[in-house]
Amino acid sequence: MENKGTNLTPEQALDRLEELYEQSVNALREAIADYVDNGTLPDPHARLNGLFVYPSLSVSWDGATPNPPKTRAFGRFTHPGCYTTTVTRPALFRAYLLEQLNLVYHDYGAHIAVEASHHEIPYPYVIDGSALTLDRSMSAGLTRHFPTTELAQIGDETADGLFHPGEFYPLSHFDARRVDFSLARLRHYTGTPVEHFQPFVLFTNYTRYVDEFVRWGCSQILDPDSPYIALSCAGGIWITAETEAPEEAISDLAWKKHQMPAWHLVTADGQGITLVNICVGPSNAKTICDHLAVLRPDVWLMIGHCGGLRESQAIGDYVLAHAYLRDDHVLDAVLPPDIPIPSIAEVQRALYDATKAVSGMPGEEVKQRLRTGTVVTTDDRNWELRYSASALRFNLSRAVAIDMESATIAAQGYRFRVPYGTLLCVSDKPLHGEIKLPGQANRFYEGAISEHLQIGIRAIDLLRAEGDRLHSRKLRTFNEPPFR
């Protein structure tokens, strides 16, 4: 006999997911409040019956579709069977989930079911946003009597293609526990609500790019012809056209409390731009991508500074990465450095075309300032102190630039199926005696940052116009989950 959780349309499935999730969250919050106020423990029998659990989303396909689509990078089945995952924050992910479900529902005739899972929601994820006020003395008791985050149950095995299919196949790369873990970390690291993140992401490794982004973003909000309606800033600042002296409101020190502060230029349709200052180093680059990936962004681009390795380069020239020498080491255990990281044609073309358009250099002239080639990413900020070994490795790789983040970001995009690209600006030439000094740095920054950032923004405009074509099949594994 059918119940209200089976044979659903995509819209019905989303409504049911939201209903079940809200039931569990409300029950967990009420139980925590009762424990804090009265010392009442949660009912163990009710917990066994699913009082605090995530909802589960399942999609089944019998393999009968005569001509399944083969050109899409997502929304495809590799074999018949039942695909399932747990879901958190279904209202936040509604547009994404609806798009994915519509593809398999209409193209494959898949059957959709929603029910309660067996995985409980950890209590820390429901406290934020509630009226609950806790102190440190309550933490031990809550951890003892309520569901908590168990790291053994959180991982990237599905995304890394390491899962072993049993009765059910994974429907998506990240289950609810992994998503909730990252959503909490994103707010902590960036200082902004996860609801404000936009699908087109720029990473930078210098604060001055932030200043330029904020200046340009404020001008866009005031422009009635611009699609951008608000700027969300690290530290909880929300800027609209009605905000008086917006740049002054943003210039306080609230963002300095956060390790990798973010700024979100928001559009009405949720297709805006997020800028994250990841500061310096591959560890930060890995960390932010680990967590940002659960939001399923459409693209992330590295727009930062690098050391130029070729004599023919000049300070202020651009480097478009076509390949990476991964000396960052932070991903070696999950993605060995001998695995090639392919460039994404759509992203490369957008960055190249954007450079031509913004710089105003026609045709072949752009090649005088734009060099394509291999970028080295190192985890050693003082690699210059091992000049002999470094120079030999650079020479063998034919590298044209060095930084500490780009290859990590590209490798994470490869792992998590997020289209990626790198356009760097040469700030010094350490192999050729042009090192970065304070006075030179200031003059360089003043002249280069605005143009470089505008190239990144223009590239996003071009990529946004690509739509679903932006997502590449070359990032799919052999047994890829159906959802993007």
Across the structure, where does each feature detected by a protein language model lie?
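Accessory terminal and edge-of-domain segments that mediate assembly/interaction
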Residues: M1-V299, G307-R484
